[in-house]
Amino acid sequence: MKKILVFIVAVLAVVGIQRAEAQSQSSYFMGGTYFRTDLNPAFAPKRGYVALPVLGGVDVDVSNNFLSVNNFVFERDGGLVTAFHSSVSSEEFLKKMPNRGRLAMNMKSNILGVGFYVGNLYFNLGLNANVSTDASMSMDIFKAVKQLGNGIYDLGNTAFNANAYMDAYVGTSIRILRNLRVGARAKLLVGIANFGGDFNKLQVNVDPNVVNGVMSGQWRANGIFIDNSMVRAGSELPLNEVMRTDLGYIFSNFKNYGLAFDLGAEMCFLDNHLRVSAAVTDLGFIRWGKKSHIGGIIDGEFNYSGMNIETSEIEANYDYELLVTDGSETQGYTSMLNCSLNIGAEYNILNDRIGFGLLSHTTFYNTMSYSELTASVNFRPLHWLSATVSHTFLNRNRAGIFGFALNLYTSGINFYAGMDYIDLCWVKGPTLGSMKPSLPRYAKSLNAYVGVGFSFGGAKDMYSDSGVKSKKAKKSKRGTEAE
């Protein structure tokens, strides 16, 4: 039983950090890429671009505050043992764990995008597909796993939320003063699916041979493939009647709409050596319609006795009900997007060839908020090349976890790629048959973003004086005209 639990935790520690994301901190100070407009709409690339499906960009991210290999390994006699070794006390193990576990995942895929300049104005428009999930949970489960003794553990007050939606956007960026650039982006949202719930009771009874539990709570679901006309109050969820697969119904059910805005600004000081910026992104909501809304209560029991190593089958039984409210009585509801706040500052030297940046990034989820602080060194050695090396602090991110991003922006191609959490410290994981894989030790998060756009037009410098005259220059011109 203990070996099985060790295996499960090792898998969770790795799976929990693999993700794709929509807010990539390392690229924030990279001047050439069109991708960073997602982080601050005041930013503008040097050229216009066209981004095509799949190639345009994919960004995936998972964040958590408890799943890392380091939280489950301990140094003993010059080597490493797992948290389930007899030499590791429960107190020592639980000291590494937060009071509540927080887990989130975001994924964005650019379906189509276009950006172009009209004089001093930069415009961009396009279409994105988005998926976001977040959950907040009790850490009592790790007490049960470590102690492996008789006891009842309270996992209540657990909540989760998931959204899938499309957004069609149009944005602009303009330099309104010699040292100030502002930007805004408006998004029309179309909801694809929403699922959420919370457990007000989730109790687990653990002994060395079996895990039993009871659960109760509330849940809701909404989506273009849901039809609640056959739902009756107090009945079990009739999945075969609620879930529609005919394309005619699905296309006619695109009735979950919303609106969101990105707002940003950047100011330059000390003759453009210091740049300070701030932005709010995904400030908006989706209104989910009544016709495609179902919800109700969760009530059930379960037991788990482990995994059969020979057959790879999980030995578990469960008995639960998803009771629903009457479809005619359900109401539409509104869900908020995961809004983000970015505040950055960069000081550059050597004619903007090297910059030192600091970025505060906070995401507000439905069940929690998540903040990080990223320091970076940004290199711009050529007019068509930039690179960044970064380190993210807060949320117990350890030294030795770095980010890296690269951007090539020639007259025909705009290519970018990067990762925010690259763990340089690896350890040997538990033996699995004849294999003993290496695992990243400290990382709780890992993201990757990559994309290719096709550039067009002449290069623009968003920090040059082109198109914006200083007050002094304007006064000088008026004086000349008066003479």
Question: Where are the predicted features?
Answer:
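Subset of outer-membrane beta-barrel
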Residues: 23-483
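Bacterial Sec-dependent N-terminal signal peptides
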Residues: 1-25, 345, 483
